[in-house]
C-alpha cells in the first residue's frame, strides 16, 4: 500500500476541505481519466483496491497512472480507551481530494474498456466520480 517513506511530523491535524482542487484537474498522461465530484478522504487501501480492479479488467492491456498519493496520517485510539490522554497513534494514510481532482488515468485502450475499468474502480471509493477524456490545451 502507498505511504510516505518519511514525514516531518507523525501526526497531523484534520484540516479543511473548502474549495476546488488546485492541481491535477486535467488528464495529462493518459487518454481517459476518473475525476472527483465530491470532497473527502481516500485511503491507501481504497487506492490499492481501485488499482487492482482496473488492472484485472484491462488484463495487461493499456497503461494506468495513479495521480494521487496518500500523504496525510490519520490517528486512532485503541478500542475501549477512555477519552483524553492525548492523541492516538497513526493508524492509516489518506489523501485529501476536492472536486475536480483526477484520480486515475488510462491509455492505449478503447473508450468502452476504459469506462468499464474506471466504473469498477469508482465502486471502491466513497465519493462520486465521473469519466473524463483528454482535452487539448494550448
Swiss-Prot record:
Among InterPro entries, the record links this protein to:
Ribosomal_uL16, Ribosomal_uL16_bact-type, Ribosomal_uL16_CS, Ribosomal_uL16_dom, Ribosomal_uL16_sf
> Which parts of the chain are coiled coil?
none
Keywords of the record: Ribonucleoprotein, Ribosomal protein, RNA-binding, rRNA-binding, tRNA-binding
Keyword Aminoacyl-tRNA synthetase belongs to the record: no
Q: Pfam families from the entry?
A: Ribosomal_L16
Gene Ontology CC: one annotated term: cytosolic large ribosomal subunit
Q: Which GO terms describe its molecular function?
A: rRNA binding; structural constituent of ribosome; tRNA binding
The answer to whether keyword rRNA-binding applies is yes
Biological process terms from the Gene Ontology for this record are: translation
Chain's role: Binds 23S rRNA and is also seen to make contacts with the A and possibly P site tRNAs.
Subunit-level organization: Part of the 50S ribosomal subunit.
Q: Which family does it belong to?
A: Belongs to the universal ribosomal protein uL16 family.
In its UniProt entry, what is this protein called? Large ribosomal subunit protein uL16
- Which organism was this protein described from? Chlamydia trachomatis serovar D (strain ATCC VR-885 / DSM 19411 / UW-3/Cx)
Taxonomic lineage of this organism? Bacteria, Pseudomonadati, Chlamydiota, Chlamydiia, Chlamydiales
